[in-house]
Regions:
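Conserved Class I SAM-dependent methyltransferase catalytic core
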Residues: 194, 247-306, 313, 317-319
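Conserved beta-strand segments of alpha/beta enzyme cores
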Residues: 186, 207-208, 293-296
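Short loop/edge segments at beta-strand edges and connector loops
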Residues: 210-213, 298-299
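Long amphipathic alpha-helices with heptad-repeat character
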Residues: 2-5, 9, 13
Length: 443
């Protein structure tokens, strides 16, 4: 029995040895290593930030200041360590809201802000400090409520863009609230301020973000499906030879250049100063009407930005669809009308008073003492409900034009965005191993 048992064990050992010899441990090792590499790769791929807090950017001036400083300190740490922000760190960066709501931090004579004034001077490089101080005039960020309303309107229209442009993006709240149905779109953002633009790059690493003035950005004409954003507004002009003859104020310039970049049938959904619609001079509206159809407009109450920007200013949301040819006759919205109380407003609002989400009154301008009009909020009104009702009244875009493809490929778009500033117009350049010809502003 002992001998038989020994022979059994030896046969079993031979069977095990033969099975082990037939196993390909090299393949198993390669498979395990490949799986580990794929896992590391998935973990290393940075993701665009998703805004889930409806009150992001809200708060008092001191809180905004503290959030801004925390974001800047983190940004400088990330850049020193040459790494991408983690999701938890993106939460900190996303609370940066710019300096439009806290100009006191740059006032050397404000005793209540003396500590913050000194802290900022130490934290920021001289060029960063100068840019931040200069941004207090128009760096007013948009509330998620208003952005969500814009996207709800675009979704109802059936807008399904392949490319999205935000030409004055701040830290990118429009990108952070992009609907899931638009998640495959290629994102292009532009931001003038260095600190803000660098934060945006950390928040949206999959987007193509250019830190520069919009007037210096190279994009092919007729290449963008959808442009969204809150354009800067003020009584000053940018230097761009292409548009010099028109003398556009900054907010009107953003409309003009963006319409050139959007393809025929594409949509522009911008928040702008009420001056675009209400100024007495009709030249800008004539320019826009020759190039785009106004699908609708919503006048926001002056309180719409009070939580996120600590400012009260009357603004409009405009929805435009680019035309291929000028209309035979200029539309009514080029002209001015009056409210029932005799307040001058755009004729669109005269004909559609339900799109004014407040009461138009005479007021003092945010830029001086000259008498101006503003949209006073309705008492106890729910802005979310008002926006939903107004959104339902926006006209549908022309479906045939909406479905047209862009004239520029994504490859051409990318090459134009990455083109060095010193490439001269009407000359050849190599981008990504391919030869391109630069026209006036794009490849």
């Amino acid at each position: 029995q002992v001998v038989a048992r020994q022979e059994h064990y030896e046969s079993l050992r031979e069977l095990i040895d033969r099975e082990l010899r037939e196993l390909n441990f090299g393949d198993l090792t390669d498979t395990a290593m490949a799986a580990a590499a794929q896992l590391r790769e998935r973990q290393a791929v940075p993701e665009n930030y998703r805004i889930t807090d409806p009150d992001i950017g809200a708060g008092g001036q001191k809180m905004k200041y503290q959030n801004n400083v925390a974001a800047i300190r983190l940004l400088k740490t990330l850049e020193a360590e040459e790494r991408q922000a983690s999701p938890a760190e993106q939460d900190v960066l996303a609370r940066y809201s710019g300096w439009g709501g806290v100009p006191q931090a740059f006032d050397a004579h404000n005793e209540k802000w003396a500590k913050e004034y000194e802290e900022l001077k130490e934290l920021l490089a001289p060029d960063e400090y100068a840019a931040a101080r200069g941004s207090t005039l128009n760096a007013h960020y948009t509330s998620p409520l208003v952005i969500q309303s814009i996207y709800d309107t675009l979704s109802r229209m059936g807008v399904q863009p392949g490319t999205v442009l935000e030409p004055a993006m701040g830290v990118g709240n429009f990108f952070g609230l992009l609907p899931q149905r638009m998640g495959d779109a290629q994102l292009y953002g532009v931001e003038l301020d260095s600190i803000t633009g660098r934060i945006a790059k950390q928040l949206y690493p999959k987007a193509n973000i250019t830190v520069s003035g919009f007037e210096h950005v190279n994009l092919p004409d007729n290449s963008i499906d959808l442009a969204v954003g809150n354009v800067p507004f003020g009584n000053y002009r940018l230097s761009d030879p292409r548009y010099k003859q028109y003398g556009f104020l900054i907010h009107d310039y953003f409309f003009a250049k963006t319409l050139d970049k959007v393809r025929t049938g594409g949509i522009v959904a911008f928040i702008t100063s009420k001056g675009t619609m209400d100024k007495q001079d009709t030249a800008v509206r004539e320019y826009l009407a020759q190039r785009a159809d106004l699908l609708g407009a919503v006048r926001l109450p002056s309180s719409a930005f009070s939580k996120t920007a600590n400012t009260e200013v009357t603004t409009d949301i405009l929805f435009l669809q680019k035309r291929d040819t000028p209309p035979e006759q200029l539309p009514d919205w080029v002209q001015l009308g009056k409210t029932a109380d005799g307040i001058p407003v755009n004729r669109y609002y005269e004909q559609h008073p339900e799109m004014v989400l407040g009461t138009m009154i005479w007021d003092k301008s945010m830029y001086g003492n000259e008498k101006e009009t503003s949209c006073q909020p309705l008492p106890d009104a729910d802005l979310k409900e008002l926006l939903a009702a107004a959104s339902a009244q926006i006209a549908m875009p022309d479906a045939e034009r909406l479905a047209r493809p862009s004239r520029a490929s994504l490859e051409e778009l990318q090459a134009s965005v990455n083109m060095p500033q010193d490439v001269r117009s009407f000359s050849y350049t190599v981008q990504g191993g391919k030869l391109y010809y630069k026209e006036s502003t794009s490849l």
